[in-house]
Amino acid sequence: MRHTYSPPLYHKQFLSLFQTLQTAVPAITAIEVFPFIAYSICMKYFSNEPDLQTTLLNRFVKYVKVWTESSSENADKGIQPSTERQLSFAKNLAEEIKEIGLKEVQVTEFGYVYAVLPASKGFENVPPFCLLSHMDTVEEVTGKDVKPIIHPSYDGAKIDLQCGVSLDIKEDECLAKAAQQNDTIITTDGTTLLGADDKAGLSEIVSSLEFLVSHKGIKHGPIEVIFSPDEETGHGMDRVPLNLIKSKFAYTVDGGHIGELESECFNAYGATVTFIGKSTHTGDARKKGMVNAICAASLFLQSLPPAERPETTDGYQGFFAVLGIQGSVEKAIVNLILRDFSEEGMNARIEKLKHFAISSAESYGARVDVEFKAQYKNMKGELEKNPEVVQNLENAYKEADVGILHTPIRGGTDGSRLTELGIPTPNIFTGGHNFHSRYEWASLSQMCAACDVLISLAEIIAANGHKNKKK
């Protein structure tokens, strides 16, 4: 069953109107807001289908324009939210969902938005479930002053943006598929990221709940929502209000391509390797026994297997990733992350890193200290203990006519940490692509499909809960 509609965008009427008005007003360019306004007008007057699609696009464009970049430096110090802009966005989001009709809406002191969509009449005793997405964007690529560009009825032509950024179907298989369907896609102007990670997820959750509020015929149980800060820093679940959450299972909406259903992820550790050397006057270095910590650190970096880096691995392969290095002759510090899908593989990776560090230090007569910090665990084991959580989701994909792609998450989500805390939480696709980059784009039809899945999921869980109640 399809609750939303993703037509072959756009209608001939839209294209005609768009071309006529752009000719009449040459100052209006594709980078500005005109295409979006024209899109809304045409969908209102030329389409007989439900306009959740328009509402969804509207909301997404609004959200990505808000700067919500998080700060790893602050988050690592325990500051949450790590930036005030996230808290400001959270407060606005809370007001929006309150107006839609959600109840118990609140923003915690740490910037989490919590709310509940009350159950349909007669479904109050259906077990609740929780939907989650995160409000922040990464700091590696700026998310300030995002200027989204809407490309209606994308035909596969190369898209040239600013700063030398271009999108080409020859280099992007998912983009090629979008072109085959004449999909509407949303990109940046090339100067920033887009923020589909995870404002696509935010938009889809809010739009789906709004749809349920206005369509009383679709029955559902109570649905909780959590919108979290600082997911991109790895601290998204540090202060999640578990005392408020009544759900025994949940779903993050933070994936990528349509159909992706993610129920396993990396085991993740951070590592800090500190080499201690000895400084002397360089003119007396041999006599005084200089020990250069930078040289030991350099040898350590060369010891890491080239075939086990992020850029040389995919699928179920783990890796070592160097994130930063700073140092002097006396002290050099290397910060890394380790990723592996199995516990055995992670344990072996930890031992391997220790060996590389110790042997590199010994080669230069330096001392070394290696510290590891667990970040999150693979959620596969816990989800296998609760198979109905994924089964409900698979049924929702089928009900929404979405093919299922079981893919491992080469990273983590708030759901992986929440699963570790006792609430099994698989991940749902959003229709966003090329995250954390100026090449990021989103597919409107795939975003609509995510809404279909969420609405179907609510129906399925309600039906199962209602059936069990009658027994």
Which sequence ranges carry the predicted segments?
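Metal-dependent peptidase/peptidase-like ectodomains
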Residues: 238, 242-295, 343-398
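Acidic/histidine-rich catalytic neighborhood of metal-dependent amide-processing enzymes
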Residues: 177-264, 309-323, 327, 334-341, ...
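A short beta-alpha structural unit
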Residues: 77-81, 318-326, 337-342, 367-387, ...
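Glycine/charged-rich beta-loop-alpha catalytic/anionic-binding loops adjacent to active sites
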Residues: 179-192, 276-280, 400, 432-436
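Acidic/His- and Gly-rich active-site-bordering loop/insert found
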Residues: 46-185
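His/Asp/Glu-rich mid-to-C-terminal helical/loop segments that flank catalytic regions of hydrolases
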Residues: 45-46, 52, 291-310, 344-356, ...
